[in-house]
Structure formats: C-alpha cells, structure tokens
C-alpha cells in the first residue's frame, strides 16, 4: 500500500473515478478483497463502500477494497494545474501488427464455420512503453481528462490483486452499469469506426457505421445478451429497437441506452457488475467459449476489459468498462496499453488492426506519446 504527500499519491492506496456527473475518490484501505463475492458479502455485513476493479477474467484476482476515507462530489473533476508528464516511448507491440492480423484471420476462419457455436470474439493487443521518469497515476488521469472531458477517467491501485504498487489508469467511454435505488441504466458500446479529421469524411464514416450490417450484428450480440442477463432481475426493461451513434475524439461507436427497474431492491450495483461482466462487447459470444478462446490465444489481459467502479451501503453505484486503459508498473516507468475489437465472420483483419490502433491512441495521446509508424 502506497502513501505519500506528492500530487495524487495520497489516494493511490485507493481509487479515483471521475465521471462527467460526479467524482469518487478514496484513500486508505480498511479491508482488501481479491474476490468480488467477498466484497459483495462485506457490503451486506455493514461495509459502507466498496471500490476497485474486476479483472477481465472473472476467475482472476480482483482489486477491491473498503476504503478508510472517501469523498463523493457532484459535477466533473477539476484537478489542480497538472505538472507535465515525463517523455513516454513505445518499446514493443504484443503481438506485432502482423501477428495480430494473423490471429484475426484465424478467428475469422473459425467464426465462418457455422457448424461450431462461436459467433464473436474480441481480439486485443497491447503496447509496452517506457517513461523517462515516474508517472504519477493521478497526474496521468488528469491529462486523460483534459484530452477526453466526456470520458469516465479512473486510477485504481491493483495491490489487492497481488500487484503491489501497480495501477490501472484509463479514460473509458462505456458505463457497464449504474444503479440508483430501483433504477438500472447502462449504455453498451459495440461496433466502431475510426474518426477522420476531414468533417465530410468523418460524417460519412459515421453513416457507414450506423448502416453497417457487420457492425449492427456485432452490436446485436451484446444487446441480446444483456437483455437475457437483466431480464430475470428486472421487473421492467426498456431497450430501443436500434443503436445510436456516439463519438470520442478517436472513434465512432454504436451505443444503445438501456433502462430497467429491479425486482429486488436488495440487488446492488456490485451484484449487477458481477452479473454483466464480461459482456460480449469485451469478450464475445457465447461468453464462456469466447473467454476460453481468448485465454488460449492471447497474453494475459490483466484488468483490460475488466470493470472499475464503486458500490455503497445502499447498493447504489456505478461500474465502467475498463477499456482505453493501461497498467502502470509500481515504479511508474512501465506502461502497458491495450486496445481490442470485436471479431465476427464478416470482419476484415486489416480494418480490425486499424480499429485497435485508433483505440490505443486514446490512452497514448493522454501520455503525449505517439504510436510508431
């Protein structure tokens, strides 16, 4: 557990989640949990707040805690003047661009076989980078917020997961689930197209995405799965007939706003996060088979594609999807940034590589780090 008085260090034995509508930041650790069920039980036994992150693979250790101190403020985070970041340089790609294309090509061949049950797999890659000086996670989060003011920006200490001093930082556009009282809201994203600096080309890309049979099918996998998961726990569930467009500075997304009313008011935000994670948007369809395919084919994703959030004693809380993120090493010099994309039978491997590159720019841009090539 880290402590200190320099900028931001005081909370990095805890948690920061800065959303457009509010900020939760904590310090100190009263109890740590490496398993989500234990944290959920602690809430029912009187814990006032649980914060942290769930790993991509639910079988891997989580990084959750009941903090000693917490502050929840309304409105956007407005950090003090940010110090400059040290220079960050990309060292290597895991896998290489050519290897990622080969992986996607193999997946497309597998998915094209209608005799097998797999319908979608999210393929990810990562970049390893090195910083000339130590990166402060909260300063990194502040720079990400400055670049992506509409994003959900986070910094989470991964010590409870057996990663002493390592931190997950990111700026995600996607809320996994929010629960306030009996009301549940979420806005899953699936289907992506890179932005273009020319407004006319950019608008055309958005129109092509909205009308894309491939991307709408990929999005439908996610929505149908969420409807099936939430149906048993919601007395009412409102799902629009089709997706809408949202954008970040790097990409266009297909998004569907979903709203529900819980059957049991004892179902907490953490319960819902555990129920929904990982969605087909970060894993695939069917989920269990896609998860095994990813575990066999890729390097360990750690907390990329996981979930970051909080849940209070009333059961209220918000959890975001841990995309557009990176893990920082304990000494602050090492960075591993991630990007992925959903693969279906109609996917084009080169286009999928371009999509991961566009997503990686979200995080690396916040570090003022350029992608090679």
Locate predicted features.
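An anion-binding catalytic pocket shared by soluble metabolic enzymes
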Residues: 9-26, 30, 125-217, 232-238, ...
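Structural signature of FAD isoalloxazine-binding scaffolds in flavoprotein oxidoreductases
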Residues: 61-78, 316-329
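Conserved hydrophobic core element of enzyme catalytic domains
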Residues: 257-373
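A generic N-terminal leader/anchor concept
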Residues: 1-62
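Contiguous alpha-helical scaffold segments within structured protein domains
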Residues: 21, 68-105, 118, 125-132, ...
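Short coil/turn segments at secondary-structure boundaries
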Residues: 119-124, 154-159, 287, 305
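A short glycine-rich, hydrophobically flanked beta-strand micro-motif that places a catalytic Asp/Glu
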Residues: 52, 153-156, 302-309
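A residue-level signal for conserved active-site and pocket-lining positions in enzyme catalytic cores
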Residues: 52, 116, 177, 224, ...
């Amino acid at each position: 557990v880290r402590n200190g008085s320099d900028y931001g260090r005081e909370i990095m034995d805890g948690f920061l989640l800065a959303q457009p509508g509010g900020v939760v930041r904590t310090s100190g650790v009263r109890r740590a949990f490496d398993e989500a069920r234990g944290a959920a039980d602690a809430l029912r036994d009187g814990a006032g707040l649980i914060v942290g992150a769930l790993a991509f693979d639910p079988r891997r250790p989580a990084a959750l805690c009941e903090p000693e101190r917490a502050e929840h403020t309304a409105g956007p985070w407005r950090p003090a003047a940010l110090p400059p970041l040290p220079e960050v340089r990309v060292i290597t790609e895991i896998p290489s661009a050519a290897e990622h294309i080969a992986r996607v090509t193999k997946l497309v061949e597998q998915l094209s076989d209608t005799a097998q049950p797999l319908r979608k797999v999210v393929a990810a890659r990562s970049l390893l980078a090195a910083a000339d000086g130590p990166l402060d996670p909260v300063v990194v989060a502040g720079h990400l917020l400055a670049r992506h003011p509409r994003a959900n920006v986070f910094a989470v200490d991964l010590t409870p997961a057996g990663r002493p001093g390592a931190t997950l930082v990111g700026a995600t556009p996607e809320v996994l689930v929010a629960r306030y009282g009996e009301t549940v809201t979420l806005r899953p994203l699936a289907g992506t197209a890179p932005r273009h600096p020319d407004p006319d080309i950019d608008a055309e890309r958005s129109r092509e995405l909205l009308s894309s049979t491939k991307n709408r099918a990929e999005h439908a996998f996610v929505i149908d799965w969420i409807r099936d998961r939430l149906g048993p726990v919601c007395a009412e569930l409102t799902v629009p007939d089709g997706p809408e467009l949202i954008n970040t500075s790097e990409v266009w997304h297909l998004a569907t706003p979903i709203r529900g009313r819980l059957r049991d008011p004892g179902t907490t935000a953490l319960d819902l996060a555990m129920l929904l994670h990982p969605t087909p948007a970060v894993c695939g369809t069917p989920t269990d088979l896609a998860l095994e395919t990813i575990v066999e084919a890729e390097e360990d994703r750690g907390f990329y594609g996981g979930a970051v959030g909080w849940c209070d004693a009333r059961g209220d809380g918000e959890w975001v999807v841990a995309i557009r993120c990176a893990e920082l090493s304990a000494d602050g010099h090492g960075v591993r940034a991630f990007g992925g994309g959903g693969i279906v039978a109609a996917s084009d491997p080169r286009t999928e590589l371009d999509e991961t590159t566009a997503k990686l720019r979200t995080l690396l841009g916040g570090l003022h780090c350029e992608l090679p090539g």
